[in-house]
Amino acid sequence: AAARRLGAFALVVEPHAVDAEDARTALARAGFALFPLDVQPRRTIVVSLTGAEEDILARMKQKTRYNVRLAQKKGVTVRRGDERDAELYYSLMHATAVRDGFSIHPAAYYRDFLRLFTGGNGTGALFLAEAAGRPLAALIATAVGREAVYLYGASADDGRELMPTYLLQWEAMRWARAHGCDRYDLWGVPDEDEDTLEAGFESRHDGLWGVYRFKRGFGGALVRSVGAWVRPLSLPRWWAYRTALRRTGRHGLAA
């Protein structure tokens, strides 16, 4: 109803649900069909936060566990930030985008995001890793119910040998546990099965392959979501949209 009031001709949703028959059936019964374009990555790694902290560390790969402790040994500290750190966060995000070749939102987006998610009744937290007064890396996570999700990460060009991103993830997991979460979603890896991922992560660096190499070390399990689904609200306009996409050669969206 809200989508119709806004003049939308179709509603696209990406439910936070595992790719299973019951989820697909429920969506189909509600009038949705599978949409060929996913906005968010369908596959992710979810880390169990059950047990003691030493149990969580023990489930990590040896190198990842070592890097967490190395960062601590090298004097890296992690503090909570807020919207007052928006400019600092954006500078780290910009450095990461330039280094890794991807696009980011304008600075105002992150400023508003931090204000809404980390202030007042927000469900999120900003973590900043520093050493000797230098900002090295940052992470934004959110916690809802029993699950926390890693949303954004950024790092400076220097100081990467101190492994600040490993300690950031660990501190975010500790924060999530303190907020009653028993799982931590690392949010986004290539949409491939585990055998393919393990066979290719050392040689591939395109897309999400680079982050898979980092995320796999935290000892989580691969999970695939049900993906994007669409419900046309105005069939004439929906068919016109599909026809226009076909004419422009964007067949994936017109399927």
Residue spans for each PLM region:
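A conserved beta-strand-loop-helix scaffold within acyl/acetyltransferase catalytic domains
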Residues: 15-162, 170, 174-178
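Conserved acyl-CoA
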Residues: 1-8, 167-183, 188-191
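A structural signal for well-ordered alpha-helical segments within the folded catalytic domains
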Residues: 87, 166-170, 209, 213
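Active-site/acyl-donor-binding loops of N-acyltransferases
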Residues: 30-54, 186-255
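Generic structural signal for secondary-structure transition and capping sites
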Residues: 8, 65, 76, 220-223
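Divalent metal-dependent hydrolysis catalytic cores, especially in the metallo-beta-lactamase
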Residues: 7-15
